[in-house]
Swiss-Prot record:
This is CREB/ATF bZIP transcription factor. Disulfide bonds: none annotated. Its main location: nucleus. Residues 208-271 form the bZIP domain. Interacts with HCFC1; the interaction inhibits CREB3 transcriptional activity. Interacts with CREB3; the interaction occurs only in combination with HCFC1. A motif (HCFC1-binding motif (HBM)) lies at residues 307-310. It is found in: Nucleus. Belongs to the bZIP family. ATF subfamily. GO terms for biological process: negative regulation of DNA-templated transcription; negative regulation of gene expression, epigenetic; positive regulation of transcription by RNA polymerase II; regulation of DNA-binding transcription factor activity; response to virus. Residues 16-26, 49-68 have a biased composition (Basic and acidic residues). Residues 127-138, 205-218 have a biased composition (Low complexity). The modification Phosphoserine is found at residue 49. Residues 223-230 are annotated as: Basic motif.
Length: 358
């Protein structure tokens, strides 16, 4: 930014001397008057005191006469200065007094927008030997007795003015930024004043969110626990159903095995009774052999499928087993034509013993 401002000032400095020279020819340029003399001359006249003006005219009578003699020996008396002219002279004298210029934008009043935005000069480049001009006069540079004119050869003064100008622009930019930020802050304060409940509402919303967040977490944890418990109970129920079905199967098998064991116990008791009645059975069977009949038995033979097996457990629950002394030890003698078969059947033995007891 500083470089661009330097370019603008350099461009304005190119046109400024030519414009100033065109307005004021070098031949007619008057040298600057002494500040002390101008101030003294400005203080002596007063608008409403004609008595004081007369001595001033008498005292300086020799000088007008000398000037009139040099111009053509015509004696012309200088007219009395008007109050307006005297005030202008006072202002010019005060302006001619060297003083420190305020750091403001008054020295930019001589610049014109057309000079800065001239389309014929799209690019301004500083030449090696070109120096920036001094500050313009406060009166726009139109009058000969305007501001303090400085020469182009005063490079140090021009550099100091350029530094001052850049510092002033920087402060102006900082002031504009501060004003804008202050305006934003003021607008924010106004908005907060217009809506006083907005800040409290935001705080309340934050508090509510802070209080709701633990509740939400607790609710989520409770829901998760309920889901876990439900899944665990469902697993237990399915396991109980499976175990119940297996238990029923095992109970049925156990009943069948119990029946089988009971039948085997009865058969073993029957066989023990047969062995105990071996002598009587042997005599009977020996007599049958003399008749000429062939004796067979199925004791050592597997019964075919569908054949009645008296050793298998019956459907009804058998009575309590008797003691070995009361066990029936008879055999079944089957006679079919010329065939006689001896069968060992506990059921037939029980029936025979029960019929004998009757």
């Amino acid at each position: 930014m500083r470089h661009s401002l330097t370019k603008l000032l350099a461009a304005s400095g190119r046109d400024f001397p030519s414009r100033r020279d065109s307005r004021e020819p070098p031949a007619t340029r008057a040298p600057p008057r002494e500040p002390s003399g101008a101030a003294a001359g400005a203080e002596t006249p007063r608008p409403g005191s004609p008595d004081r003006e007369q001595p001033h005219g008498d005292g300086d009578g020799g000088e007008p006469e000398a000037r009139s003699g040099s111009r053509g020996s015509v004696a012309v008396r200088a007219p009395a200065p008007s109050p307006l002219k005297m005030e202008e002279e006072e202002e010019d004298a005060i302006a001619m007094v060297p003083k420190e210029e305020p750091e403001d934008m008054d020295f930019l009043s001589g610049l014109e927008l057309a000079d800065l935005l001239d389309p014929r000069q799209p690019d301004w480049h500083l030449e090696p030997g070109l120096s920036s001009p001094g500050p313009l006069s406060s009166s726009g540079g139109g009058s000969e007795s305007g501001g303090l004119l400085r020469g182009d050869d005063d490079d140090d003064t021009a550099a100091a003015e350029m530094q001052r100008f850049s510092d002033l622009l920087q402060r102006l930019l900082n002031g504009i930024g501060g004003c804008s930020s202050g305006g934003d802050r003021g607008g924010g304060e106004k908005r907060r004043r217009k809506s006083p409940g907005a800040g409290g509402g935001g705080a309340n919303d934050g508090n509510q969110a802070a209080t709701k967040s633990p509740r939400k977490a607790a609710a989520a944890a409770a829901r998760l626990n309920r889901l876990k418990k439900k899944e665990y109970v469902m697993g237990l129920e399915s396991r109980v159903r499976g175990l119940a079905a297996e238990n029923q199967e095992l109970r049925a098998e156990n009943r069948e095995l119990g029946k089988r064991v009971q039948a085997l116990q009865e058969e073993s008791r029957y066989l023990r009774a047969v062995l105990a009645n071996e002598t009587g059975l042997a005599r009977l069977l020996s007599r049958l052999s003399g008749v000429g009949l062939r004796l067979t038995t199925s004791l050592f033979r597997d019964s075919p499928a569908g054949d009645h097996d008296y050793a298998l457990p019956v459907g009804k629950q058998p009575p309590e087993p008797r003691e070995e002394d009361d066990a029936a030890g008879g055999v079944c003698l089957h006679v079919d034509k010329d065939k006689v078969s001896v069968e060992f059947c506990s059921a037939c033995a029980r029936k025979a013993s029960s019929s004998l007891k009757m």
